[in-house]
Amino acid sequence: MPIVSWPELLEKLLSTKEISEIEAKALMKAWLNDELLPVQTGAFLTALRAKQISGLELSSMAEVLRDACLFPYPLPEVFMVDTCGTGGDGADTFNISTAVAFVTASCGVTIAKHGNRSASGKVGSADVLEGLGIKLNAPLELVVKAIEKNNITFLFAPAWHSSLINLAPLRKALGVRTVFNLLGPLVNPFRPKAQVLGVAKSELLDPMVEALRNLGLERAVVVHGAGGLDEASLEGPNEVRFLENGQITSKTLDVEELGLTISPNSTLKGGSLATNQDILRSLFQGRGTQSQREVVALNSSLVFWASGKELDLKKGVTIALEAMELSKPLDKFNELKCCLE
């Protein structure tokens, strides 16, 4: 017998009430164990989408997912940072957080980048990295070794979260974003102690930063970019939540105060896989457009803050721009590529 009544739990969600930690964990375990009918799963996913998700609901589900993750190795004993967005902003930008991962790693930050292919026909982090020569199906021991040897690695989500495979057809059939799009950034198998996470909607700022706090992160930045970007944006003021030692601070980030130029999000457009690959190659060598370089530097400054490397965001911007100018991200990319071969 389930520890909760599924009809009662569904009714609770449909009434837009917050479900408890026990209920959220029971629901996730039922999904992972294939205990619910497809129609029940569809109803729960729809009900969760229709209500305002809470930090407790997210962290409770994420804990179950992390525990179910395949990880037959000791966790790397280094202070790691993940950088990603939830997606769903519709802006079709190039792979900003992927570029940021290599820029910041080239400056000494240890990056555990957790990502996947795009489910929307766009170009996800895994798509662009594979196109550039990163081996997604590398033996998991090499993925672990890379972070110890090169201070950066890429964790291809399906290789670690095989328990979610049975849900993939239903999620695809629903055709809309679900709670799993929010959970993806929260379930990095390496359990980094710091993270920079972008959200496409401002109402997700507080639930996501609260979830990160519940999951035990020491430092984190959750950002909602101007113009609805799930990255820090050059278009205008960015809403930010900073998490440090359990304390959450809300701030508005003015890009001009950081020495950057206001630019519309349209200047950050990506395109085909080949286009996005070319943009990353250019940025890794200090080329690309001014807007492309500056948005990567802006988001890199948040990673530097989260890592503790540089708490002054303006100085962080300068560090990132100089790294690109010296082609340091390209060297770091080539190191990872060789390590995973």
Curated annotation (Swiss-Prot):
Q: What class of enzyme is it?
A: transferase
Show the Pfam families listed in the entry.
Answer: Glycos_trans_3N (PF02885), Glycos_transf_3 (PF00591)
Q: Which residues bind anthranilate 2?
A: R171
Q: Which EC number(s) does UniProt give?
A: 2.4.2.18
Q: Which residues bind Mg(2+) 2?
A: D230, E231
User: Which cofactor names does the annotation list?
Assistant: Mg(2+)
Question: Can you tell which superkingdom this protein's organism belongs to?
Answer: Bacteria
Q: Which GO terms describe its biological process?
A: L-tryptophan biosynthetic process
Which pathway is this protein assigned to?
Answer: Amino-acid biosynthesis; L-tryptophan biosynthesis; L-tryptophan from chorismate: step 2/5
**Residues engaged in binding anthranilate 1:** G85, N116
What GO cellular component is one of the record's annotations? cytosol
Q: Which reaction does it catalyse?
A: N-(5-phospho-beta-D-ribosyl)anthranilate + diphosphate = 5-phospho-alpha-D-ribose 1-diphosphate + anthranilate
The residues the record assigns to binding 5-phospho-alpha-D-ribose 1-diphosphate are 85, 88-89, 93, 95-98, 113-121, 125
UniProt keyword list: Amino-acid biosynthesis, Aromatic amino acid biosynthesis, Glycosyltransferase, Magnesium, Metal-binding, Transferase, Tryptophan biosynthesis
- What does the note under cofactor report? Binds 2 magnesium ions per monomer.
UniProt-listed PANTHER family = ANTHRANILATE PHOSPHORIBOSYLTRANSFERASE (PTHR43285:SF2)
Q: Which family does it belong to?
A: Belongs to the anthranilate phosphoribosyltransferase family.
Q: How does it assemble?
A: Homodimer.
- What role is this protein assigned? Catalyzes the transfer of the phosphoribosyl group of 5-phosphorylribose-1-pyrophosphate (PRPP) to anthranilate to yield N-(5'-phosphoribosyl)-anthranilate (PRA).
Q: What is this protein called?
A: Anthranilate phosphoribosyltransferase
Q: Which organism is it from?
A: Prochlorococcus marinus (strain SARG / CCMP1375 / SS120)
UniProt lineage: Bacteria, Bacillati, Cyanobacteriota, Cyanophyceae, Synechococcales
Which gene name does the record give? trpD
